[in-house]
């Protein structure tokens, strides 16, 4: 409305908001009239809130990139073949491409691939790391590797994405405010929840996500998806890349 008022040089603008019921053939129409000054004041307040939020995100990114450049391999020595794997992974992280690697259990594949990608943050080439796995043990190994690198000084944030049926507070109910109380007012609350959570924490596993969601009475599944937009490392099932119904966009 403000953009239209500015474009047409209008002092007042009429706005119509139409709500459509999901399951009934019903509409709720609300009409408003705003002065240009009112619109400017409202938009300025919204922008101020968004800018404060993104200032937190940008400070985290700057600190992440700065500390990633000085991160050493988190163990005193490389195991056999770890150095070679890390070298090839770093080349992919910087230049793109695909690396297929097959190695026995126990060689240290997780840290050998995650470490070079974390280091690449300092070059400004990559914005986010997805770690995909089919097993919960793989998720835990990735989470432990990230925590190990953080203990060595790099400033990272990560979310471990949990399947909806395992984290949902209201299993069996449809994901809409009419059936699930944790969906009600979700988008009214989420900006404040994200701002406080990202300022306070850098690790978001299922237990922490559930505690935050319960404290604010919001959906934990949607919360972890919204957190994934702003963290550095996303650890999740490979379906979130390959399944067209649920994949991250």
Please identify what each model-predicted range represents.
Residues 1-39:
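Nucleic-acid nuclease catalytic cores
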Residues 246-248:
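Short, conserved "post-DEAD/DEAH" coupling segment immediately C-terminal to helicase motif II
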Residues 90-91, 110-125, 144-149:
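Walker A/P-loop NTP-binding motif
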């Amino acid at each position: 409305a403000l953009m239209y008022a500015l474009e047409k040089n209008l002092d007042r603008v009429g706005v119509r908001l139409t709500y459509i019921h999901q399951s009934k053939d019903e509409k709720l129409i609300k009409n408003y009239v705003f002065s240009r000054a009112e619109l400017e004041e409202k938009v300025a307040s919204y922008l101020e809130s968004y800018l404060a939020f993104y200032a937190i995100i940008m400070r985290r990114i700057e600190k992440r990139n700065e500390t990633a450049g000085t991160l050493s391999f988190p163990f005193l020595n490389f195991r056999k073949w770890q150095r070679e794997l890390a070298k090839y992974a770093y080349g992919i992280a910087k230049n793109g491409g695909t690396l297929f690697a097959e190695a026995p259990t126990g060689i240290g594949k997780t840290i050998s691939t995650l470490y070079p990608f974390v280091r690449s943050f300092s070059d400004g080439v990559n914005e986010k790391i997805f770690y995909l796995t089919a097993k919960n043990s793989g998720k835990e190994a990735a989470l432990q590797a990230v925590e190990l690198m953080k203990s060595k000084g790099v400033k990272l944030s990560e979310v471990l994405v949990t399947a909806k049926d395992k984290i949902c507070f209201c299993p069996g109910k449809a994901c809409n405010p009419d059936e699930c109380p944790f969906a009600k007012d979700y988008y009214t609350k989420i900006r404040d929840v994200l701002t406080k959570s990202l300022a306070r924490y850098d690790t978001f596993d299922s237990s922490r996500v559930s505690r935050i969601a319960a404290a604010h009475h919001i959906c934990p599944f949607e919360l972890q998806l919204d957190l994934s937009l702003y963290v550095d490392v996303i650890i999740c099932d490979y379906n979130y890349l390959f399944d067209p119904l649920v994949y991250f966009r």
